[in-house]
């Protein structure tokens, strides 16, 4: 099952995400980089979920006063320039949540930005991303799996 309009040719396996949220008993979720809020709305059917996206005025609120237990960040990091990833991941880390769920594309998008650059600015292999996540979240367990048919990786991070 998927959600949204298939933006950048990835579809989310909602069963896997739902299982992750269930296993880690997620109640308060932040959808970091929520875009138009499709996943936020979907998750609000079963959880309390807030959407944050600095590029979308409607969702440009980091909700720092809320005690989230889980952050989901799907199809976001590949859109961030490599030089800005450390700052972004450290911002995510500063929420001090128990569990995090990322999906990251490992291929270039079909879509170009108005200036001609590819929409996916940081396209790296699984091991590169794994090292970045393990370095940033060194106090947690990091599991990275590759979904080659979708040209993406799934990253699960939780307390040791």
Predicted feature locations:
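A short acidic, helix-capping loop that chelates divalent metal ions and anchors anionic groups
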Residues: 109-116
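A conserved beta-strand element that flanks and buttresses the S-adenosyl-L-methionine
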Residues: 72
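Short, glycine/serine-rich, charged loops/turns that create anion-binding
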Residues: 56, 107-109
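Conserved N-terminal segment of class I S-adenosyl-L-methionine
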Residues: 1-68, 86-90, 95, 116-132, ...
């Amino acid at each position: 099952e998927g959600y949204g309009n298939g933006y950048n040719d990835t579809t989310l396996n909602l069963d896997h995400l739902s299982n992750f949220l269930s296993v880690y008993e997620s109640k308060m979720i932040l959808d970091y980089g929520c875009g138009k809020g499709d996943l936020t709305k979907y998750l609000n059917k079963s959880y309390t979920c807030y959407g944050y996206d600095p590029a979308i005025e409607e969702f440009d609120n980091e909700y720092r006063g809320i005690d989230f237990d889980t952050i989901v960040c799907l199809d976001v990091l590949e859109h961030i320039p490599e030089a800005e990833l450390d700052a972004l991941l450290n911002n995510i880390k500063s929420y001090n949540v128990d569990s995090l769920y990322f999906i990251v594309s490992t291929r270039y998008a079909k879509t170009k930005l108005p200036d001609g650059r590819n929409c996916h600015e940081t396209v790296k292999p699984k091991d590169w991303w794994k090292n970045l996540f393990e370095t940033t979240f060194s106090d947690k367990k990091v599991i990275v799996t590759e979904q080659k048919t979708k040209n993406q990786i799934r990253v699960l991070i939780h307390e040791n």
